Regions:
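Flexible "cap/lid" subdomain of the alpha/beta-hydrolase fold that forms the substrate-access gate
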Residues: 2-170
Length: 173
């Protein structure tokens, strides 16, 4: 959105993992409610304030380990090979339900790294990061000028083979 709103100040765009989508006719939250009706979807789970916070803050280390390690290449490969998909969970599931656990840390994460993250989130809590998801409806209402917006600057989108965004296809729903 920054590039579409500030064309003269942004010379190029590189998107990582999350592709750009212009503002549509309905909000992404309303779209997700239609697409995932009767199914679990993490962004809908995050909407009710306090629910995800309570689950994650119960054991921040477990939340971080399960989240990070289930969506890295090893975790996504495991989920693909075992036909595990978050949309197969019911609408009343919790976020951590059914997420695969691993006995070892991947090479890109050390115990010291995890200790630091746990310490930071124990101090700040999870509300701030989750509020970004909750602001989607506000963005939809406030950014009418982004309807059908296009990124006019030179741009590229980069994703990895096992990036979770590649598995959010409607085919899986």
């Amino acid at each position: 959105n920054t590039a579409a709103l500030n064309e003269s100040r942004i010379s190029a765009v590189l998107g990582l993992s999350v592709p750009f989508f212009p503002r549509g006719k309905i909000s992404t939250i309303d779209l997700f409610k239609k697409i995932y009706q009767g199914k679990f979807f993490y962004q809908l789970y995050f909407q009710e304030e306090g629910v995800a916070e309570a689950e994650f803050e119960e054991n921040i280390r477990k939340y971080l380990e399960l989240t990070y390690f289930s969506i890295d290449a090893r975790g996504m490969r495991f989920q693909k090979e075992n036909a595990i998909n978050a949309s197969s969970k019911g609408p009343n599931a919790r976020y951590l339900d059914g997420i695969p656990e691993f006995d070892t840390y991947p090479s890109w994460m050390t115990n010291e790294d995890m200790d630091y993250l746990v310490s930071e989130f124990e101090n700040s809590g999870m509300r701030g990061p989750l509020n970004r998801y909750r602001a989607q409806q506000i963005d939809f209402e406030d950014l009418l000028e982004l309807t059908d917006a296009k990124i006019k600057q030179p741009s590229a989108f980069l994703t990895g083979k096992y990036d979770p965004v590649n598995f959010l296809s409607l085919i899986h729903i």
